[in-house]
């Protein structure tokens, strides 16, 4: 029998969505900026998590009202998209969403057309994003890298210094991982390792469901230069792995069919500790990259061309690494057991191929391979006195690292909400009429939200300081640390352009969906449940 449904319409529906979004945004609002506060999250066991990271706070929020919860789900999607794309800016994204939806609903209630408002918002966002891209300054020095890292770590100088140092040690070619240390001191170590752009083949293989990643310690690594569809091919390896109790990472051309389904079922049952990813590259380049990974991990590539079969695989064919981390989009291998002389010989071979390369494309790809093999992985081991402090510091390191990477990709802009404010000034050039003009004005007002919130969290009047900033030169803004309006670029208060433009883009996209929503449908409350709550 189908479950009865409840339906609410138009203004009532939008108001419920807004209530959910506002509750969620209100929780994270006071965490914004270097003088933002913390939020405590109850855990079913152990110490509570104390954090000022918007994504961590928002992730577990579930409201009692089913319609408000739909609004929360929409806000969560914005935060998740920003987190995946940039790693930072989640709190600003939630505040922008609240501002856009609140102003949009207010105007719709006054008779404006939702479609016209959305069209105007889309045009305004496009103009603001282009202005941010135009204003972006490339990151060239270690000091600029450090400044971005410090700002993203809520002004923590130690974290900024360590992230900048790690970046310098491995350059753009290497990878950086953040781990929990065993003492109170935080340290950096560069180890043999590699990162490549291939994620897990199934999310059901994740070991850390909170972050949706696979984490393995002292894992064995199987490299296969073909597609695996039948579980029978893998049985000898899986039986040996299960007997040893070690974790296994499979890197193959592809894994599907009953091979994948059996791996997933056994992983969920706890019978096997296994993960699988597709091999990086295509064709001959894939074969070469598999050989690079084999050199790094002391493995042998299982290939029919070499006369090695999966069914009769020698024990020595499996490589190993101290730590493996697999996300939705990438795989990082840390501490491979390959001999240093073998890695050096492999790099020398790639150098020879670079010298012989005819096309610039081939040369570029070979240089990428060389960089991955020689760059290594910088491991930052975070030290803290308590578990609660450890979790908070590790989260700050993660945010700082993600922001710094974003800054290196697309450049920096003045921080403290000033980049959005400056970019929104270009909306005066946009000649719109009617409801489209209303939509553009809503975006203009939303762009003032982050700076006003940062000022309020510092203990000042947001509107008063905003007026002072609007009458100041282009890069001037409110520095929450010094509590005065000054040149933020010169003061080192900077944000990654990529983060700023994506927070606005994703917030506006979801706001448009909310404004165009005319009805909400949910399961009807059970009569017995209603009576029991009375």
UniProtKB/Swiss-Prot annotation:
<keyword id="KW-0067">ATP-binding</keyword>
<comment type="function">
    <text>Together with its co-chaperonin GroES, plays an essential role in assisting protein folding. The GroEL-GroES system forms a nano-cage that allows encapsulation of the non-native substrate proteins and provides a physical environment optimized to promote and accelerate protein folding.</text>
</comment>
<feature type="binding site">
    <location>
        <begin position="31"/>
        <end position="34"/>
    </location>
    <ligand>
        <name>ATP</name>
    </ligand>
</feature>
<feature type="binding site">
    <location>
        <position position="416"/>
    </location>
    <ligand>
        <name>ATP</name>
    </ligand>
</feature>
<keyword id="KW-0547">Nucleotide-binding</keyword>
<dbReference type="InterPro" id="IPR002423">
    <property type="entry name" value="Cpn60/GroEL/TCP-1"/>
</dbReference>
<keyword id="KW-0413">Isomerase</keyword>
<feature type="binding site">
    <location>
        <position position="495"/>
    </location>
    <ligand>
        <name>ATP</name>
    </ligand>
</feature>
<keyword id="KW-0963">Cytoplasm</keyword>
<dbReference type="GO" id="GO:0042026">
    <property type="term" value="P:protein refolding"/>
</dbReference>
<protein>
    <recommendedName>
        <fullName>Chaperonin GroEL 3</fullName>
        <ecNumber>5.6.1.7</ecNumber>
    </recommendedName>
</protein>
<dbReference type="GO" id="GO:0005524">
    <property type="term" value="F:ATP binding"/>
</dbReference>
<dbReference type="GO" id="GO:0140662">
    <property type="term" value="F:ATP-dependent protein folding chaperone"/>
</dbReference>
<dbReference type="InterPro" id="IPR027413">
    <property type="entry name" value="GROEL-like_equatorial_sf"/>
</dbReference>
<dbReference type="Pfam" id="PF00118">
    <property type="entry name" value="Cpn60_TCP1"/>
</dbReference>
<feature type="binding site">
    <location>
        <begin position="479"/>
        <end position="481"/>
    </location>
    <ligand>
        <name>ATP</name>
    </ligand>
</feature>
<dbReference type="InterPro" id="IPR001844">
    <property type="entry name" value="Cpn60/GroEL"/>
</dbReference>
<dbReference type="InterPro" id="IPR027409">
    <property type="entry name" value="GroEL-like_apical_dom_sf"/>
</dbReference>
<dbReference type="GO" id="GO:0051082">
    <property type="term" value="F:unfolded protein binding"/>
</dbReference>
<keyword id="KW-0143">Chaperone</keyword>
<dbReference type="GO" id="GO:0016853">
    <property type="term" value="F:isomerase activity"/>
</dbReference>
<comment type="subunit">
    <text>Forms a cylinder of 14 subunits composed of two heptameric rings stacked back-to-back. Interacts with the co-chaperonin GroES.</text>
</comment>
<comment type="similarity">
    <text>Belongs to the chaperonin (HSP60) family.</text>
</comment>
<dbReference type="InterPro" id="IPR027410">
    <property type="entry name" value="TCP-1-like_intermed_sf"/>
</dbReference>
<dbReference type="GO" id="GO:0005737">
    <property type="term" value="C:cytoplasm"/>
</dbReference>
């Amino acid at each position: 029998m189908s479950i009865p449904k409840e339906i609410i319409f138009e203004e009532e529906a939008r108001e419920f969505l807004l209530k959910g979004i506002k509750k969620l945004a209100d929780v994270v609002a006071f965490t914004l900026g270097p003088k933002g506060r913390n939020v405590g999250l109850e855990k079913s066991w152990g110490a509570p998590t104390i954090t000022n990271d918007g994504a961590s706070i928002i992730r577990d929020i579930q409201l009692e009202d089913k319609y408000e919860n739909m609004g929360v789900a929409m806000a969560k999607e914005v935060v998740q998209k920003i987190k995946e794309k940039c790693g930072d800016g989640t709190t600003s994204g939630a505040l922008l969403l609240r501002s856009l939806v609140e102003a949009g609903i207010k105007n719709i209630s006054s008779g404006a057309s939702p479609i016209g408002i959305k069209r105007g918002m889309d045009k305004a966002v496009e103009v603001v994003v282009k202005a941010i891209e135009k204003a972006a300054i490339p990151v060239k020095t270690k000091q600029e890298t450090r400044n971005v890292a410090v700002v993203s770590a809520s002004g923590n100088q130690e974290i900024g210094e360590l992230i900048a140092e790690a970046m310098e040690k491995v350059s753009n070619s290497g990878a950086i991982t953040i781990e929990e240390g065993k003492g109170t001191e935080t340290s950096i170590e560069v180890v043999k390792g590699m990162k490549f752009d291939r994620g897990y083949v199934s999310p059901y293989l994740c070991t850390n469901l909170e972050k949706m990643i696979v984490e393995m310690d002292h894992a064995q690594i199987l490299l296969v230069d073909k597609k695996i569809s039948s579980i029978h091919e893998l049985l000898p390896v899986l039986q040996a792995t299960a007997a040893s109790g070690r974790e296994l990472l499979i890197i193959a051309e592809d894994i599907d069919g009953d091979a994948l389904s059996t791996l997933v079922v056994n992983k969920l049952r706890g019978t096997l500790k296994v993960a699988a990813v597709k091999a990086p590259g295509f064709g001959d380049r894939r074969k070469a990259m598999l050989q690079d990974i084999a050199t790094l991990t002391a493995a042998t590539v299982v290939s029919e061309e070499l006369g090695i079969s999966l069914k009769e695989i020698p024990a020595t064919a499996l490589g190993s690494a101290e730590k493996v981390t697999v996300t939705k989009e990438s795989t990082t291998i840390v501490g491979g057991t390959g001999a240093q002389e073998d890695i050096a010989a492999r790099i020398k071979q790639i150098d020879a191929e670079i010298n012989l390369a005819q096309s610039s494309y081939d040369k570029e790809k070979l240089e990428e391979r060389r960089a991955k093999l020689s760059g290594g992985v910088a491991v930052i081991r975070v030290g803290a006195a308590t578990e609660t402090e450890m979790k908070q510091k590790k989260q700050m390191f993660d945010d700082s690292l993600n922001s710094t990477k974003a800054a290196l990709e697309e450049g920096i802009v003045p921080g403290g909400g000033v980049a959005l404010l400056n970019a929104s000034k270009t909306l005066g050039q946009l000649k719109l009429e009617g409801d489209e003009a209303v939509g553009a004005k809503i975006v203009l007002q939303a762009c003032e939200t982050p700076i006003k919130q940062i000022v309020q969290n510092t203990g000042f009047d947001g509107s008063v300081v905003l007026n002072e900033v609007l009458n100041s030169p282009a890069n001037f803004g409110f520095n929450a640390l010094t509590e005065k309006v000054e040149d933020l670029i010169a003061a080192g208060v900077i944000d990654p352009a990529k983060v700023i433009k994506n927070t606005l883009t994703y917030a506006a996209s979801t706001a448009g969906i909310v404004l165009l929503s005319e009805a909400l449908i949910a399961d009807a409350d059970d009569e017995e449940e209603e009576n029991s709550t009375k």
